[in-house]
């Protein structure tokens, strides 16, 4: 079984990260072909691996604005299976609506994935293991994390492209709040809020680093996100092999400056690449897809 470790890697010692942007106007497009072609660009070796997809499933969302769209999740799962993965799990631990089954029905996930059975894991109630934190960015000294996350061979963060009224943005890194079980940390993951949102984001991502990122930006959310914002069509899917680089690029797509987001700036020194010059840009250039996202007044300083 793979066991994820908390790791800090100085920025200067890492090779350039890769981020790929695809224009995708509607969820009705051939997402399987688009996603499979995009994943192939990264030459991922998936044979016989157990993959965990971690979408952003926040709450009841029949309009598809709040959560990662099920069409993206389903096509991604099928693509990894085509690439030779032995098993592709889907898991999340929603923070707001505690009825995970009701959320799955609301977003119509099984219409795009078929019956999942044990291939879906409610991370709020999964068995946990203790992970000692090396970062100690927050007040926490340790985290109790789901065994499903720690045991995955390949872990994919699949956020929605959204602003956040407390964190500025919620993307691949903030999405990992959903792996921290509510059974241990309360709802809506209150212990993490008390420990400091930004610093908790750093600790979680160091303890359970995603191997890959796929951002659903076909339809995002601006303003008072992550729940009460307004739908914003950005028309993109974003892929990356570094969660910091992916989040930084997603911010630039949104017309926001990632270096002004405190936790992202810190992450750029120890977890991944923040600077555009250290990110190999594939597919569409940021300038071709930039869509200005509105933010709450506390984060107006993020705007380019």
Q: Residue spans of the language-model regions?
A:
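N-terminal and secondary-structure boundary signal
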Residues: 1-304
């Amino acid at each position: 079984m793979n066991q994820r470790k908390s790791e800090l890697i100085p920025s200067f010692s890492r090779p350039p990260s890769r981020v790929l942007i695809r224009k995708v106007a509607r969820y009705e497009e051939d997402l399987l072909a688009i996603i499979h072609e995009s994943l192939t660009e990264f030459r991922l070796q998936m044979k016989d691996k157990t993959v965990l997809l971690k979408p952003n499933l926040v709450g009841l969302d029949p309009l598809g604005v709040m959560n990662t769209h099920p069409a993206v999740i389903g096509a991604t799962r099928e693509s990894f299976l085509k690439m030779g993965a032995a098993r592709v799990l889907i898991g999340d631990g929603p923070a707001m609506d505690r009825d995970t089954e009701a959320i799955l029905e609301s977003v119509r996930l099984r219409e795009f994935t078929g019956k999942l059975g044990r291939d879906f894991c409610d991370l709020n109630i999964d068995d946990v293991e203790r992970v000692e934190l090396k970062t100690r960015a927050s007040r926490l000294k340790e985290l109790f994390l789901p065994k499903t996350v720690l045991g995955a061979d390949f872990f994919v963060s699949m956020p929605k492209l959204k602003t956040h009224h407390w964190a500025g943005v919620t993307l691949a890194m903030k999405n990992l709040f959903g792996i921290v079980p509510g059974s241990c940390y309360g709802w809506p993951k209150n212990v993490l809020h008390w420990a400091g949102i930004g610093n908790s984001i750093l600790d979680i991502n160091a303890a359970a680093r995603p191997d890959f990122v796929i951002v659903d930006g076909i339809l995002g959310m601006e303003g008072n996100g992550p729940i009460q914002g307004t739908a914003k069509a950005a028309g993109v899917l974003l892929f990356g092999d570094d969660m910091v680089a992916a989040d930084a690029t997603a911010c630039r797509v949104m017309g926001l400056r990632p270096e002004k987001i405190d936790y992202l700036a810190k992450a750029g020194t120890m977890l991944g690449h923040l600077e555009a010059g250290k990110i190999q840009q594939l597919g569409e250039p940021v300038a071709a897809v930039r869509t200005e996202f509105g933010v709450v007044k506390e984060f107006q300083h993020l705007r380019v």
